[in-house]
Amino acid sequence: MSRSGKDPGKRVKTARKRSASSTRWLERQLNDPYVKQAKADGYRSRAAYKLIELDGKFGILKGASRVVDLGIAPGGWAQVVRKVRPKAGIVGIDLLETEPIEGVTILQMDFMADEAPAGLEAALDGPPDLVMSDMAANTVGHKQTDHLRTMGLVEAAAWFAIETLEEGGTFLAKVLAGGTDNDLLKLLKSHFKTVKHAKPPASRKGSSEWYVVAQGFKGR
């Protein structure tokens, strides 16, 4: 018997009856070069390479000194920032519990809570010059519903950035294509000097995700 009181043999039997979708996911993970590289490089997720690639294209981390990572778990993006900008202050926030990362302050809370902006600014000892978000809502399998749920998060993250960034700062976020993208771009263009988007090579080919990079915050 295991510590949970369940017969391990039954778990093996269940594993053999994996759904086709979970089997495909497992096979994809096992054959994914980014997953293998993440393990070799010590990153917690393959998403780390998306930030590395986006930084190479847009210089997102150049000069960053106070960074907020919204939805930090499991921590791959924060690890990249820590490696590229070792002297930067980094604060991550997530509803999920996140394993500690050396040099990173992690707050387990809702970034949309009223007290979140002040708490993050206090932890950074000043306003952030980079707010980044790799968040996506839990999917339900309905493309438009998944799009709207994630875009709701992205828009909330954008407003968080607008309310907290120092002048000249940068906002980076994951977006799911699906119809309301233009509303987000319109919002960002009214608050940032340049707004660009890209799909980094590390994004899976079949994914509808892309990333928006808004630079040169105009101030409040």
Swiss-Prot record:
Which molecular function terms from Gene Ontology are attached? rRNA (uridine-2'-O-)-methyltransferase activity
Q: Where is this region: Disordered?
A: 1-24
- Pfam families recorded for this chain? FtsJ (PF01728)
InterPro entries referenced in this protein's UniProt entry, alphabetically: RNA_methyltr_RlmE, RNA_MeTrfase_FtsJ_dom, rRNA-MeTfrase_E, SAM-dependent_MTases_sf
Q: What is this protein called?
A: Ribosomal RNA large subunit methyltransferase E
Q: What is one term from the GO cellular component aspect held by the record?
A: cytoplasm
**Claim: Cytoplasm is one of the keywords in the record:** yes
Q: Which family does it belong to?
A: Belongs to the class I-like SAM-binding methyltransferase superfamily. RNA methyltransferase RlmE family.
Q: Reaction(s) catalyzed by this protein?
A: uridine(2552) in 23S rRNA + S-adenosyl-L-methionine = 2'-O-methyluridine(2552) in 23S rRNA + S-adenosyl-L-homocysteine + H(+)
Give the EC number.
2.1.1.166
Active site per database record: K174
Superkingdom of the source species = Bacteria
Q: Keyword Transferase: yes or no?
A: yes
Keywords (A to Z) from UniProt: Cytoplasm, Methyltransferase, rRNA processing, S-adenosyl-L-methionine, Transferase
Binding-site positions, S-adenosyl-L-methionine: G75, W77, D94, D110, D134
Role noted for this protein = Specifically methylates the uridine in position 2552 of 23S rRNA at the 2'-O position of the ribose in the fully assembled 50S ribosomal subunit.
Segments of skewed composition (Basic and acidic residues): 1-10
HAMAP family, alphabetized:
RNA_methyltr_E
What subcellular compartments does it reside in?
A: Cytoplasm
**Which Gene3D superfamilies does the protein's record reference?**
Vaccinia Virus protein VP39
